[in-house]
Every structure is written in structure tokens, then in C-alpha cells.
């Protein structure tokens, strides 16, 4: 492609158009959710997704009480529990008024990108294309196969707020860690539904000891982490705060869509098997040259999901590490079935984080 033809081509791309529409009002809030994209610094253009959620808090709405009763699945809460800061913070995201048809503008690498109108659930998903050279300006990502592209939302004049987002631009080779959340890095007690709801809505999140340090040691050497969980997007702010507070490495989040208006809170407890298979499959297909470590727990169906994916992607999946909370054995009926045709040396049951491989041990699995 000649320089003239390239310039003409770039000028026709959507991101090159003047972007001005921004419907954000002062009573609306936006959450920018981390995303990822395959990155090749030798490519002329880089394609990457943006993900935003726009809503208006409705804490004093008439239907709040009924929805809260649904949300807690009939668990009797004391007045003190209902008024606790933890419960109010966690439950408020389920009670917001999701804003449909709102348009936002993102500032990315000196470009203004007009995002499409939000959907009924308040979410906006947009695929952007920018010149790779613009993403690398000012030395960003120098000497790194993978790095984080940061961006912001444009706010109306006089609005003092700032909304900041991240896109993980990930190189073709290296290690990717796919991690479950509940009972893998955070104590949830998923198998006891009453305890699960209390740990989710009433108690401070408690980390699984040692997991943050182990993940950090991997990321320090260049690994990228993807948190894939059956939790709903409404818990993303709390989960992101939790991972930051207890010093888990930052990464992308992959959670389920859920609206209390569309069903019941019992849908929150539905097995996430199909969702996890689809989300992780996308990661594997996006990065065919990367090696993957899957980390989960035995409380639900992580062994079965990970085993199925390992059979589909034999060369990529080099470790399946399962936190053993149900007294499993690798040679019992369940694990034998879950890991059928998966090399035994790639399967690990662990009780404590120090049983997970060090970075040097992980590299030996390449």
C-alpha cells in the first residue's frame, strides 16, 4: 500500500471522524471495564475493544425493597445488616437505572472516538482501530511485548469527574493466566448458597492466602492475568476494589450479564459452565501462540471446563491448577473423567498457594 493510499484509507476509518456527541449528565455514572487485544508493534493498525457501562443510581426507588428481597434469596437480614456500608455498596449496583441510548466519547492516544449508543443494559461495546504508531508515542510500551493502553472519557464542560479505562495490548507469545475468582482467589463458599450470599453482600471480601503474591510473581516476569468468573457485572466495582486492596495484579475481567428485572436472583446461582467455556475459548483463539495456565477450584465445575478446553487446545494449555476444597484426588472418578486425554503432568491439585509452580517452574512447561 502506498503512502497516499494508506493516508486515504486511514482517513475513511470511523475513528478519524470528528467525535462530539456526549450524553453524560451529572447524575449518571460510568464504569470503564478493562479489555484486551492482540498486539503486534510491526502492524500498521491496531484493533482493540472498549467496554463501558453507564447508569444512574436509584437507591431511593419504590421497588428497592422488593428487589433487595429477591437479591438476598430470602435470607433474613437484620436492620443493621441492611444499613451496613458493605451491603449498601454491593447491592446498589443491582438497583441502578441502566441508561439506554446514551452516547459517549473516549479520548485514546490523542484521538476522540465516538462510541455507539448504550444498549438496554447500559453497556457499550465498541471495536476501535488506530494507527499503531500513535499507540506507541512517547515511548509507551517500549521494550515490552505486552503493555497497558490507558484512556479517558470526555466529560461535559464544568464536570470535574474523570473516568479512566485500560486496554491490555498483549503480544503474540508469552504466558496468560486464566483465573476463577470465587473460592480460587476469594473465599466465597459457593457450595453453601446461604454463606455465598452473605460473603457476597454482607461481609468484607477475604482473599485466599498467598494467591496474590504468586500471581504477582508471574506477572512481574511478563504474564498477563484474565479473571473469568460467573459473577455478574454488577459486582465488578467491588471485585476490582478487592483485587487492588489485597494486591492482586491488575488484569482483564470477564463476568456475566445479569439484570434483576429480566429474571430472579436465583439466576445468579446458575452454573457458569457455558459462559466460561465461551469466554476462555475467545482468549485461546485470540492468542494462538501464547501458553496458558488455568487456575480454579473444585467447588463447582472448573476442572470440567478447563479439561474440555485443554483437549481442544492441547498445545496452548500447559497447566490446570485446581484449589482442592472438596477433598478430590487426581485418580478419582471425577478428576479422571474431567482430565480425560489431558497429560497428567499438566494437572495439579493444590491446597495452598505455595504449591503452585514458581515462574521458573512454569517456564519449564513451555
Model-derived features: where do they sit?
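Bacterial N-terminal signal peptides that target proteins for export
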Residues: 1-8
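Intrinsically disordered, serine/threonine/proline
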Residues: 19-166, 355-366
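Short beta-strand edge segments in extracellular beta-sheet folds
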Residues: 166-172
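Asp-based phosphoryl-transfer active-site loop
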Residues: 175-188
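Short, acidic loop-to-helix structural element flanking the phosphoryl-transfer center
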Residues: 201-224, 233-237
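Short, surface-exposed connector motifs at secondary-structure boundaries
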Residues: 217-226, 285-292
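C-terminal cap/substrate-recognition subdomain and adjoining C-terminal extension
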Residues: 231-366
Amino acid at each position: 500500500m502506498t503512502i497516499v493510499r494508506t493516508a486515504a484509507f486511514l482517513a475513511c476509518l470511523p475513528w478519524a471522524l470528528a467525535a462530539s456527541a456526549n450524553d453524560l449528565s451529572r447524575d449518571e455514572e460510568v464504569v470503564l471495564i478493562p479489555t484486551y487485544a492482540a498486539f503486534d508493534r510491526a502492524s500498521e493498525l491496531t484493533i482493540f475493544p472498549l467496554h463501558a457501562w453507564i447508569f444512574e443510581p436509584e437507591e431511593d426507588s419504590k421497588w428497592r425493597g422488593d428487589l433487595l428481597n429477591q437479591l438476598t434469596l430470602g435470607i433474613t437480614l437484620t436492620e443493621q445488616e441492611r444499613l451496613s456500608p458493605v451491603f449498601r455498596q454491593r447491592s446498589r449496583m443491582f438497583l441502578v437505572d441502566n441508561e439506554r441510548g446514551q452516547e459517549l466519547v473516549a479520548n485514546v492516544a490523542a484521538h476522540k472516538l465516538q462510541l455507539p449508543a448504550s444498549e438496554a443494559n447500559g453497556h457499550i461495546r465498541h471495536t476501535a482501530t488506530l494507527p499503531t504508531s500513535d499507540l506507541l508515542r512517547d515511548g509507551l510500551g517500549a521494550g515490552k511485548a505486552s503493555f497497558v493502553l490507558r484512556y479517558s472519557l470526555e466529560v461535559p464542560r464544568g464536570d470535574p469527574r474523570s473516568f479512566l479505562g485500560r486496554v491490555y495490548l498483549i503480544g503474540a507469545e508469552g504466558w496468560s493466566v486464566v483465573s476463577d475468582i470465587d473460592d480460587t482467589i476469594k473465599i466465597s463458599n459457593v457450595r453453601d448458597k446461604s454463606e455465598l450470599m452473605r460473603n457476597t453482600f454482607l461481609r468484607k471480601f477475604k482473599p485466599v492466602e498467598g494467591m496474590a503474591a504468586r500471581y504477582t510473581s508471574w506477572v512481574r516476569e511478563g504474564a498477563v492475568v484474565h479473571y473469568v468468573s460467573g459473577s455478574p457485572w454488577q459486582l465488578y466495582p467491588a471485585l476490582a476494589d478487592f483485587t487492588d486492596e489485597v494486591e492482586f495484579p491488575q488484569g482483564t475481567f470477564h463476568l456475566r450479564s445479569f439484570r434483576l428485572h429480566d429474571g430472579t436472583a436465583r439466576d445468579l446461582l446458575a452454573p457458569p459452565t457455558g459462559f466460561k467455556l465461551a469466554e476462555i475459548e475467545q482468549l485461546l483463539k485470540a492468542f494462538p501462540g501464547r501458553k496458558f495456565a488455568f487456575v480454579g477450584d473444585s467447588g463447582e465445575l472448573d476442572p470440567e471446563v478447563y479439561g474440555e478446553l485443554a483437549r481442544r487446545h492441547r498445545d496452548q494449555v500447559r497447566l490446570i491448577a485446581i484449589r482442592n476444597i472438596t477433598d478430590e484426588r487426581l485418580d478419582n472418578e471425577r478428576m479422571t473423567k474431567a482430565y480425560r486425554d489431558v497429560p497428567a503432568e499438566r494437572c495439579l491439585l493444590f491446597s495452598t498457594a505455595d504449591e503452585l509452580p514458581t515462574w521458573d517452574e512454569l517456564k519449564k512447561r513451555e
